[in-house]
């Protein structure tokens, strides 16, 4: 009998998980402890100091008679600050699209208004370009700058400027840029 002759019992596209030897042993021990499975839980999170969150998607959760829980699943580190920043960026983008759609309906299409719009856009680009130039980082720790850029999602130049304004104090620089 070859592998081609074995009938497939698993439908295509099904989510199949392969358990390790240690996990199989642990599950057998759980069954011996008479723990009851808790259905309907889609995500378990454990919060640690400093907004560090361990998240387990699609966990297998069991409850003991004493009220303690046993959770099986793959734990992944989840950064809430990054999630919040992504959600805010998406919301701002959505608001900008709705505002642009509303402005497009009411905008004047005369040649003068189009020229004014182009001039305003070119002025905005120049201010951004000036901000992105070479930045003097002497006296500042590059790790501090990278942390501020990561936390506040601003350019490196703005992070350096904020650090200099607060004499190297990262907390106040982040608060200013947030």
Curated annotation (Swiss-Prot):
Composition bias, Low complexity:
87-104
So which domain of life are we looking at? Eukaryota
A Gene Ontology cellular-component term: nascent polypeptide-associated complex
Q: Per the record, which residues fall in region Disordered?
A: 87-142
Function noted in UniProt: Component of the nascent polypeptide-associated complex (NAC), a dynamic component of the ribosomal exit tunnel, protecting the emerging polypeptides from interaction with other cytoplasmic proteins to ensure appropriate nascent protein targeting. The NAC complex also promotes mitochondrial protein import by enhancing productive ribosome interactions with the outer mitochondrial membrane and blocks the inappropriate interaction of ribosomes translating non-secretory nascent polypeptides with translocation sites in the membrane of the endoplasmic reticulum.
Assembly: Part of the nascent polypeptide-associated complex (NAC), consisting of EGD2 and EGD1. NAC associates with ribosomes via EGD1.
Q: Under what name is this protein listed?
A: Nascent polypeptide-associated complex subunit alpha
Q: In which organism is this protein found?
A: Meyerozyma guilliermondii (strain ATCC 6260 / CBS 566 / DSM 6381 / JCM 1539 / NBRC 10279 / NRRL Y-324)
Q: Name the gene that codes for it.
A: EGD2
